[in-house]
Structures are given as structure tokens and as C-alpha cells.
């Protein structure tokens, strides 16, 4: 009899527990603090915030727990993997995105954009690529502030994917060079950036490339011979400083050779 009475005494506590849990669930569902009331988008370089919000599928009033989770890492950081996937699919210029919950009532979109650093021309226009060779945009007019990669032709073009060309080794050499230029431009000591001064990149056989560089002070053209390798970033940094100091101003046309142990300028 005592055992039966003990069993019966457990039931009220169990029902109270269920009632409390149901009440908590109801509060979580109904309270405004668990509803989306703002979407945080950082200042973007090439995208407008409203199209990004529209493509995300997020709407004000949506419950914050809807779509939350995914794998363990995404759950631990309160992320929305479906929102991230939608944005990556909608915008080829987005390199990475993190959609995460921020109490109260906010979802933050942290977006890293790809930056166009060169382009490849084709009969109807050109395609701009980033430093990894990913196709970003198709334009009819050739841009003036980034270089053209000559000697390669696109064979397959899918925005958001690496551009496929007829000479992959040449494209790889150009991509390596662009990476070295971007690294050199991170140095804060020189007064000018190198990338905007480069008009053409033409890979040769092997690891060598020709660059056409515009001298910033005079507007003259300088042909530069470079070579992919561990010293290429240092070579590009040296070239950047030389341009800033006007080292080749007024010397006429010629070729600056950066491939040997000594940097030499040979007039035409």
C-alpha cells in the first residue's frame, strides 16, 4: 500500500513539470523578444543591403528559432545555414557569410565580399575575376582600373566558380602574380597602390610574365618582366616603391627585368 501511494504521489509533480514546460514553450513562441525585429547588414563594397535582405528570405516577425542550427558548430554559434546558402547562391561576389542570432530580436549577416582584381576579354565583353580566379561579373565595357589578362580565352564561365580557360597554366601564373601584387599593396609605407597602375598581364611559357605598368607621375608605359616564385611579393613591393619615387620617369620605353638577382632596365 505504501508503494502504491508513493507511485501516486509522483503523478502530480510530473504533471506540474509538463505544465511548466508547456508554459515556457508558449512564452517562447509568443513573446516579442523571440521574434525578428531587425536585420543587421554591414556596409558592403559592391552590394546594396536591401537586395541582400530580400535574397536571405528573412522577414520581420519571423520566429528566431526557425531555421536555427545545422551541424554542431552552427548550432553552437546560433547560425542559420539555410540563410547563408541562399545568399551564397544568389550573389557570386559573396565569398563567405555568417547569419547568426543576436538577442533580442536581431539576426546579423556578416558578409565577406570578393574583390575583382583582373579581367579576361571575350568577343561580347569581359568577365571580371578575383585573386583566386573566381568569375564575378560580366561586363560589356572593359574596366579601366584593373588589368586584363592576355593570352587566355575562357572555355567555361559560371559566375561564382573558378573561370576555366584554354591555358590553365597561364591563368595560374597570372593568379599567383595578382596575389603577390595584393600582398605588396598591403604595405602602408608607399604613397601609391600597385594594382591600379597595371594595365595588362601576359603570361609566357613557363613561369614568366610580362606586365604593362603605367607610371603614376607621367602616364608613360613601362614593360616589366616578372617570374612566379617565392620572391615575387618582394619584387612587387620593390616595384611599388620605385613607381612612387618616380625611378623610371622620363627614361623612355624599355623592359624592367625582375627575374634575375639584380633588377635591370634595358631601353628599347
Question: Which positions does each model-derived feature cover?
Answer:
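Charged, solvent-exposed interaction patches on well-folded alpha/beta domains
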Residues: 1-40, 50, 55, 63-66, ...
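Short glycine-enriched loops at secondary-structure junctions
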Residues: 44-47
Amino acid at each position: 500500500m505504501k508503494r502504491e501511494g508513493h507511485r501516486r504521489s509522483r503523478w502530480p509533480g510530473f504533471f506540474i513539470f509538463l505544465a511548466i514546460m508547456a508554459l515556457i514553450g508558449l512564452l517562447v513562441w509568443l513573446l516579442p523578444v523571440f521574434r525578428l525585429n531587425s536585420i543587421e547588414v554591414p556596409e558592403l563594397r559592391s552590394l546594396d543591403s536591401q537586395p541582400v535582405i530580400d535574397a536571405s528570405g528573412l522577414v520581420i516577425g519571423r520566429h528566431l528559432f526557425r531555421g536555427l542550427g545545422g551541424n554542431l558548430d552552427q548550432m553552437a554559434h546560433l547560425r542559420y545555414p539555410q540563410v547563408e546558402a541562399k545568399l551564397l547562391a544568389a550573389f557570386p561576389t559573396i565569398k563567405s557569410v555568417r547569419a547568426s542570432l543576436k538577442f533580442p530580436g536581431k539576426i546579423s549577416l556578416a558578409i565577406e565580399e570578393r574583390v575583382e582584381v583582373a579581367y579576361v576579354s571575350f568577343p561580347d565583353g569581359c568577365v571580371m575575376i578575383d585573386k583566386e580566379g573566381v568569375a564575378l561579373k560580366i561586363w560589356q565595357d572593359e574596366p579601366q582600373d584593373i588589368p586584363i589578362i592576355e593570352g587566355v580565352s575562357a572555355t567555361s564561365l559560371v559566375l561564382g566558380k573558378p573561370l576555366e580557360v584554354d591555358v590553365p597554366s597561364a591563368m595560374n601564373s597570372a593568379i599567383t602574380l595578382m596575389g603577390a601584387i595584393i600582398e605588396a599593396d598591403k604595405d602602408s609605407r608607399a604613397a601609391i597602390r600597385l594594382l591600379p597602375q597595371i594595365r595588362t598581364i601576359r603570361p609566357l611559357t613557363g613561369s614568366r610574365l610580362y606586365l604593362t605598368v603605367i607610371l603614376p607621375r607621367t602616364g608613360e608605359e613601362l614593360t616589366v618582366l616578372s617570374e612566379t616564385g617565392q620572391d615575387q611579393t618582394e619584387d612587387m613591393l620593390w616595384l611599388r616603391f620605385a613607381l612612387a619615387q618616380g625611378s623610371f620617369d622620363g627614361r623612355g620605353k624599355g623592359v624592367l627585368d625582375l627575374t634575375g638577382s639584380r633588377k635591370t632596365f634595358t631601353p628599347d
